Each structure stands twice: as C-alpha cells, then as structure tokens.
C-alpha cells in the first residue's frame, strides 16, 4: 500500500498516473487528503500510544502485549479492514462498548515515559542492541529474516 496524497494544485491526470505507477510496481494506491503524519502513521501511532499506556500503567507487560496484539487484532486486521470489522461486529456493538470504553482510552499528547527513559539510557531498539527487549546481533538477523519471510507469506495469502 502506498498513500497517494495530491496537493491542491495536483491535476487528476497526475494523480491517476501516480496511482497507475504504484499498481505497476505491485502495490495498492490509496488516495487520501493530506493530514499530518499521513493516515497509516496516524493509525499506527494511536495503537502504539494505547499499547504503551497499558504497559506504563502495569496492566500488561511488553511480552504479553506483543502476544495479545499479534494473535488478536493484528491477526484479524491482516485480513479485514477496520471499517469492515465494524460492519461485521455490528455498529450497535461498537456503540455500546465505545460509549464506556472510549472515555478510558489514552488521550496523552506526550511520548510515553517508558520510551523517554529508554532513550535516555541509550536504548534505541535493535540498532543499539536493545530497547524494550535485549538483542544479540544473531537474534537481530534472525528476527529480521523471520519478519521478511512472514510478511511475504501474509502478502501471498492476501493475494490468493
């Protein structure tokens, strides 16, 4: 997926040509209006903010959270978009749950204190050998290779 974001002066012809190019290289163009961070990052960062809030408050540890997301919503969202999920579950269900749950979700405008603490200690993630988790160079190589292989497999399954 590649976000196609035309400016105010961008012609329809240019947008169509960009979308055609995206399709030719094997991706799905998604046309949208400009918004800070673009749509994909905004959705990702909303998820990350809530995940970090749950860890910061001691509701769940990082390992449990990764398992929960990987085998819960991540697994589901690989095959159905959020708007389709709403229709499948029922808008009345979303309304009932959202009426009490939305008020308890994180609305913080700040970066997680956990993240800031880790950065302050020089723990920037895999590139420094550790962030939330610790990594050896061999583990990093294995994780990156496994991720690439799984992404290819998921893409093939979605295209089937």
Protein language model features and the residues they cover:
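Structural/interface elements that position substrates and couple domains in central-metabolism enzymes
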Residues: 27, 44-48
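Mid-domain beta-loop-alpha active-site segment that forms a flexible
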Residues: 39-40, 47, 89-93
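AAA+ ATPase "lid" subdomain C-terminal helix
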Residues: 45, 55-56
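A general alpha-helix detector
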Residues: 1, 47-51, 96-101
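NAD(P)-dependent Rossmann-like dehydrogenase/reductase catalytic/cofactor-binding core
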Residues: 13-16, 23-34, 56-57, 62-160
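Conserved phosphate-handling catalytic cores of large alpha/beta enzymes
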Residues: 1-10, 14
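Glycine-rich "substrate-gating" loop/helix at the edge of Rossmann-like oxidoreductase active sites
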Residues: 7, 35-40, 57
